[in-house]
Design a protein with these regions (language model features):
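Short helix-perturbing small/polar motifs within transmembrane alpha-helices
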Residues: 11, 15, 78-130
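Interfacial aromatic-anchored transmembrane helix boundaries in multi-pass membrane proteins
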Residues: 24-33, 63-91
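Alpha-helical transmembrane segments and their membrane-interface exit regions
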Residues: 40-49, 66-67, 82-94, 146-147, ...
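Membrane-interface interhelical loops and short interface/amphipathic helices
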Residues: 108-109, 120-171
Length: 242
């Protein structure tokens, strides 16, 4: 049964509001912070069941709500949560008809590679944005880790701990990126399972065991590793994080 446009966009609005509430749940205390991890689930459900247009509406509403609550979290939500879902939905719903009359959908391996590329692009932009700070991105990351450890321990950290933080700080942005990619995959897969179970899926569920990645992520990884080995400063730190 096809939903009318008004109904579809009403559902999209509800999905956007729910997504914003999940994202803002962290303000309610540490016990609710895990709800933030499924922030993208309502957006994926709307997109995979209703299409790109409703997904855009849901993303815009969710971003607007979070921005009205606090501008900085609103920007973070728009860039880190809503926009990547909209882009993923756009690609996921691409299909073409083969010579035999069968439909071929956008490969899941490319969806995963696109998410990886998006995370890498955000990391590069963050490095450029932090380049004006003392020691660039490295200084910002090291300072943030030190502050967190001081809060957790309730005391100043020693020179040995500071040395270890400085040595391995480049891993931290990459770990955040990996966690973000994992979040995208989990929310997308859960949403596809939900809409498929309800018989509302616009595309068939792909076989995740047959995922084939394109070649370009391997070349990008090799290039960033070389820059990390021979480079230094802000560029070398960002390349190491990649």
């Amino acid at each position: 049964m096809n939903l009318g446009m008004t109904t579809a966009f009403a559902i999209a609005a509800i999905g956007g509001l729910l997504s914003a509430l999940l994202f803002l749940s962290a303000m309610g205390g540490p016990a609710l912070i895990l709800l933030q991890y499924i922030t993208q689930l309502p957006l994926f459900v709307v997109g995979l069941a209703l299409g790109l247009g409703p997904a855009v509406v849901a993303g815009v509403i969710a971003s607007a709500v979070t921005f009205l609550v606090d501008s900085l979290p609103g920007v973070i939500f728009a860039v880190g949560y809503a926009l990547p879902v909209v882009l993923a939905i756009r690609q996921a719903l691409l299909t073409r008809v083969l010579d035999g009359g069968q439909s071929e959908w956008y490969p899941p391996g490319r969806l995963l590679a696109n998410a990886t590329g998006y995370a890498a692009a955000i990391l590069v932009m963050a490095a450029l944005w932090m380049s004006g700070a003392d020691d660039g991105m490295a200084g910002v990351v090291i300072g943030a880790i030190q502050q967190v450890l001081q809060v957790l321990s309730g005391d100043q950290i020693g020179p040995e701990a500071e040395g270890m933080i400085a040595q391995y700080a480049f891993l931290f942005p990459g770990l955040i990126g990996m966690s973000w990619i994992f979040m995208m995959v989990i929310n997308g897969a859960l949403a596809q399972g939900l809409v498929s179970g309800a018989g509302r899926n616009l595309r068939p569920t792909p076989s995740f065991v047959e995922i084939e990645l394109p070649d370009w992520p391997a070349y990008a990884l090799g290039g960033s590793a070389q820059i990390w080995l021979i480079g230094g400063g802000n560029i070398g730190f960002a390349a190491g994080a990649l």
